[in-house]
Amino acid sequence: YVEMSPTKVFLIQLLNIAGLGPVFGPILGALYGPIALLWVVIGCVFAGAVHDYFSGMLSVRYNGKSVPDIVGYNLGDLIKKLMRVFAVVLLILVGVVFVAGPAGLLSQLTGMHSMLFVAIIFAYYFLATILPVDKIIGRIYPVFGCALLFMALGILAVLLFSGKYTIPEFTSLENCIADPERFPILPMLFTTIACGAISGFHATQSPLMARCLRSERQARPVFYGAMISESIIALIWAAIAMAFWNGASGLNAAIAEYGGQAAVMVDVIARTTLGEVLAGLVIFGVVACAITSGDTAFRSARLIVADFMGLEQRSLRKRIYISIPLFAAGLVIIFCLPFEAMWSYFAWMNQTLAMVTLWMLTAYLNKR
């Protein structure tokens, strides 16, 4: 429980929930055509922002409790016990996904072995997980949060004012992906674009910042505002992906050419539209976003475990005791599962948690 300024809390919340989601997800989701833009807008306004606001606000009302405990208060002890395990597994998967993604991108850019970057990122994650929130996260994350916003605004400026790109018009609900039978809109679009529309992972991050707010009045601009901001970022990247490759058909061809690697496509877009120097800053921003979501995922997992075990977290030794098994599990996953499998499990668990959170919010409001 470390009080911080509302602006700083907002920027940290935005960075915690964003990660690679509002960049990679919309680029891949744009394969489905302009309907992806519709999903981001409707999903965010009517589901995602509501989900994020209430999960954060209820954490404030329940004195900073984590999402499994809040679920337990409203849906019963059995669901709470299941959610404890479910949330911790999801958070470990998030942490691992956001190790493998940036490590692979850094390896591609530098030519150095990806395992070196995995080791460096894991070491940083461990420090950020066990240290108080104001020591690392509170100091550098607001800077990264500003970088994320400026990165998206730079792409938007090119999209609107360069005169080179035209955003495809929304004319039908047609599935524009290359293989529509294998990848139907329902449910694949809704797991491809999660961050920017609705993501259960956000419910695990909101309690981190709920413990840093000065009053309940700050909850709406922080939690609702951060989700709206993430949705705008997602819209920008989905729009530039479609405009850059002249529609969904061109984007499908580009995906095939680059082997489905969204990181490579971000690099191509950035270098072409912004130039080498600014493109380097964009890639740095993408890597930073992924890493800053990964470390707070492990931090959230530690807090959830500490809550249900009843362990106070003032002692550094106890924080280390809880963190070691979590990181050991993460290492096992990263060495035993390919990235595609990790991402598939994460995508399913992420939206399942979002469903449970909305169920819990409905029960809470129904009681009142």
Language model segments and positions:
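Flexible loop linkers connecting adjacent transmembrane helices
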Residues: Y1-M4, L28-G29, P34, V50-I79, ...
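Helix-loop-helix module between adjacent transmembrane segments
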Residues: I12-I17, F46-N63, V67-L131, A194-I198, ...
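Membrane-helix boundary/coupling elements in multi-pass transport proteins
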Residues: L20-I27, L90-A103, T191-L213, W237, ...
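Membrane-water interface regions at transmembrane-helix termini and the short interhelical loops
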Residues: L31, L58, V97-L109, F122-F144, ...
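Loop-to-transmembrane helix boundary motifs in multi-pass membrane proteins
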Residues: D77-K81, M115-A119, G225-A234, M242-A248, ...
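Hydrophobic alpha-helical segments and their helix-loop junctions in multi-pass secondary transporters
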Residues: G95-I120, Y125-T129, L148-I177, L361-R368
